Amino acid sequence: MKIYHGRKRGLIIMDHWLSLIFIIGFIIVHFGSKYVKLSVASPRSFWFSLFGGATIAYMFLFLLPELNQYFEAVKSNVGDSWPSILDNYTYLLALIGLIIYFGMDLYARSRKDVDEEDPDSTSEPVLLVHMSTFVFYNVTIGYLLIRGEFISGMDLTVYFIALSAHFIVTDFTLKELHSGVHDKYGRWILSAAVLIGWLIGALYELPTWIVSIAISLLAGGITFNVFKEELKESTFKNYFAFVGGAFVIAALVMVFT
């Protein structure tokens, strides 16, 4: 994320402890998805739209602007040899991320239609293929939780709130597609992935160009997954919930980041 020089050591240590608390929170969100009942069919739950609005606001107001900073950092490291054709490469990668997640979602849904009467309507191999994209998702989010140079504990807290909201939506989407298989395996895989990302960040600082690619693909995936859900049989109630979630996170981002 942003690089802030001259931060006090005590603040950095506090943020690391806070990130540990939040990584545990992410894991609880994934495990708790088995026990929370929300409507994914029509009428869709008010909460899905609220969480979707919160996530998309965070992406547009925080993640996408960060791509510019990473792009400038990568470009300055390369120097004059940087090809002008790649001046928008971070946004191109975000588009590629959207396309990848769209394709994987279509694949999973096409496999589900093969046998609608099976309670575990998609097989374990299909779940694992689909889940691989969300493993990348979670590893990136876990890494940024500790390596993102947030300016304060509140800044980090806004990140946790927005991404927790998104995890709730994606967990229920995966449950809709993969039924009992997700409860049996998926939530374990997602919990492990976000923890692994955090551990990588605790032990290593990845090169800027790798982080920029990861955030770009993540932004594309978030865009697809949020709007895919909002375009399903939504009502004005869902719309106003979406606007409310977006407004709250937008206000928090503007105040604390």
Predicted regions and their residues:
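Intrinsically disordered, metal-sensing/regulatory segments
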Residues: 1-257
